[in-house]
């Protein structure tokens, strides 16, 4: 702690780990800090305030946090006035131990009171002692807080927070609480305001997004919300994540198929293809229901790309159980999957289940699963060679774009496509480019032919306006990309 006085604006950096909810929460943390007078630390410069927005779903989340805190200890000791704050799910879980294991931490705050961060930082500075404040229920719905959006053309929009499911492997509901829903009018007002600012793609976000409406008793609230988004003038693309198979109903499928700006893309977490394992996981669906949902989605939207989450090595999983998962992967023909080796989390029912699977068995099954997922994804991508696709061009999409002199974007189905921009034509993030796919790989497509068409958009204008004036770096380091960027494996899945 330090009582050093500061005459210039204090700088900040937010480091984010985990799911999309954390990415969006970090946009709010950034907005709160800037609203309180902090400025983003320029690239390469040590920030006065470093905020960790943490994840608690997987075991390596703990190791990652405390490892990073350890690296900062000597930096803080040599930097008068520097402060470190830890928030998010791991802070909610480890509230009593963080300042014991890392006594140089100044502030610990939870998932329910992110709006308190600026006040807690100031209190820690003035009182010269650590401030630990964890609430057990939501203080203010996060959507009311100041937000600094990372993208000029795409945005997260929360429809709910919390989760009412009780999956035995997941600790998130105990950390984020029961589901609380925003009212449709409030959500649509935010969407319309974003579009007015130049956003043309939104992703509706919830721990169990299609359960939206349970709090106010409307079982079709989510499908109605999708259709209402279709009426927002200027909104090009609507996506959502993540649904739960148990509540995924035919009215949602119909709304997706019948609303032109709802994209033909679905992320539907499987977790396991074994009915026995699904029962042990307390997932309230079985293999037949899951495959039936996918069949109805593809009947309504033949070109839909479907991705999933799969956990390998859940306690009690036998070779036959695993083969059932492989069967579902073959039948479902996912365009991609986030695959995870089961991680025991203290405080979850699964942590105490008998028959924990040996690590070497889990590793073998994981490698076989990944190989199959990649094989199928590649086959599905090859079918798109020769097809024309309209891409929303995005910033920071391809790691090799600078070396290959390409740009990157996402198709309606959310597949990543790298393409060669035409000479003499400015194509900005947020603009729409139509290309013809010439090459397929398991995780991306390439369009090396001429660009068929470019449509300049209000989102491209917004991106250009944001980047016209010199500005410091965003101050946010994301464990996952911003909306519109490619989707590599996240640190952990959301509660789904």
UniProtKB/Swiss-Prot annotation:
Q: What residues bind [4Fe-4S] cluster 2, as annotated?
A: 163, 167, 170
An annotated GO cellular component of this protein is: cytosol
A molecular function annotated in GO for this UniProt entry is: N6-isopentenyladenosine methylthiotransferase activity
Q: What is its EC number?
A: 2.8.4.3
Quaternary organization: Monomer.
Homology family: Belongs to the methylthiotransferase family. MiaB subfamily.
Give the protein name, as stated in the record. Answer: tRNA-2-methylthio-N(6)-dimethylallyladenosine synthase
Q: Specify the species.
A: Nocardioides sp. (strain ATCC BAA-499 / JS614)
Gene behind the chain? miaB
